[in-house]
Swiss-Prot record:
Keywords: Chloroplast, Plastid, Ribonucleoprotein, Ribosomal protein. PROSITE patterns: RIBOSOMAL_L36 (PS00828). This is Large ribosomal subunit protein bL36c. GO terms for biological process: translation. It comes from Stigeoclonium helveticum (Green alga).
Length: 37
């Protein structure tokens, strides 16, 4: 899980999701997991 100021989709499988005021990226590739904060 990477914590970043700017969260972006890295590949076509990445999905942007909002959970409890946090923006997450969930993907098939575990390296693409990100959250903002």
């Amino acid at each position: 899980m990477k914590v970043r100021a700017s969260v972006k989709k890295i590949c076509a499988n990445c999905r942007l999701i909002r959970r409890k005021r946090k923006i997450l990226v969930i993907c098939v590739n575990p390296k693409h997991k990100q959250r903002q904060g």
